[in-house]
Amino acid sequence: MAKEYFWGATLSKDKKIFKWDPESDFLDDEDDDEEDSISHFLFLKQAVLGVNAKDDDRNVIEVETINFDGETVIQPLLSLRLGLNESTNLDIGLQPPVTFKLALGSGPVYLSGQHALDLQEDEEFGKDFEGAEAYEVGDEDLEDEDEGEEDEEEEETPKKGSPKRIVKKIAAVKGRMKGKGDELDEDEDDDEEEEEEEEEIQTAKGKKRPAPSAKGPAKKLAKVDKDGTSKRKVPNGSVENGHAIDDDEDDEEDEDYKVGDEEEEEEATSGEEEEEDEEEEEEEDDEEMALGDDDDEDDDEEDDEDEEGMDDEDEEEEEDSSPVKPAKKAKGKVNGTAKPKGTPKSQANKGMKEKKTYSLEDMKQDLIKSPSKPKKEEKFKNFVKSKFHLSEGKKIQELWGWYKSTQLTAK
């Protein structure tokens, strides 16, 4: 715990030396024990020249104290002069004893700071005092316990001589043990029943037959001896020769096998349906890609794609004719005849394209008037091919150079 107080001192021509030692100034010999628990510190903060100081009078303050090695140190601390520097800030910590001296000048010089007191040792003294009290309380508790034990021994001595009380105690203990034993037996029975139910559920789930093939469900396995009697394994490990050992167990096994077979059949059928759906989606994607390419390519490329489309349809017919998968109708067929890849709309457009031919100047005029102007070379080439049915790379490159030089790409 620390406390701080204001401190001030004045040095002048009448009093040039001031000694600060609170440990020796304010305490008597009787208070030595109290002083050991207090530490004093002095923190200098400011020095100010008084109003009565003389002009051109230099004032120098020296400090005398003891350093860490126990040696006396004398050091100039500050210098003040009227009209030049009349005050100065300080940040110096000192421990007693300290002596301040006006070594030069007539002053007056006013020193100010903080006097701090550290009371940490008082807390330790309080802890020691609390420990002493706790020790005394502990001794009292021990004495009370000893007295209580002596009283109990005195009470037990007459009880030992009375057999009736002993018999009653034994009977009461036996009754308690019996009640606890019955409760334990009931708990064990409940635990066993729960374990049996869990085992039955696990066996019902785990009794799955081997994975069947796609052709059909697995069949029951049975061994036949030479005499014609069938043998099959029973869950308890025994073998039955033509007769059922336990009808209830056989019925449960048959039900489990049926459930397992039905689940396996459902899994097999669902797997086939998923495969069929995936194949149909792939075929639809292929057809959409083929139709998109027909609109962008020229006449020769459209003919090639028509031939490829016919090849794809032939492959689909071969896949549909396989015995494993059910027959499906190929898309694009009506009444057994395949539709051509090109739609009537595309065929009409094709006829219109063949009728009209474009010259280089016509193409340039159309490009200038066209509202949609591609900015990249690849898009420009595709645009020219689809609009003017131009397949000559030289003319396309010439158009691109003109198109780029006219700065139509920036519009």
From Swiss-Prot:
Region (Disordered): 134-378
Compositionally biased residues, Acidic residues: 134-156, 183-201, 246-321
Keyword field contains Nucleus: yes
GO molecular function annotations of the record: chromatin binding; histone binding; RNA binding
Top-level taxon in the UniProt lineage: Eukaryota
This protein's GO CC annotations: cytoplasm; nucleolus; nucleoplasm
Protein name, entry field: Mitotic apparatus protein p62
Organism: Lytechinus pictus
